[in-house]
Amino acid sequence: MKIINLTGAALDWAVGTAMKLPPPYWADGKCANFSTDWAQGGPIIERHHIEICHLDNGEWRAQLNANQWGFHCRHYGETPLIAAMRCYVASKMGDDIEIPEAL
């Protein structure tokens, strides 16, 4: 599945997988909601220096300048957390990943 299409449980699963967490993914004693809960997604944004910007069209853009060669990952979303988590997953796993059918 293309990262640009990930939302909800599928996006949260991808974030947990990118972080190499064992399923089920837990954060603060509850099931992880990285793409909707700032307490869970915010530390990822801070730790990986993901830049977030609101665009004139209402979307959010997140980008990650990852190395000295200028490689950057850029993704968009309806919210800052969705954009940032898509960017994080793509930086770790590429722009196209396999998602379990149950999600």
Residue ranges with predicted function:
Residues 1-103:
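Glycine-rich anion-binding surface patch
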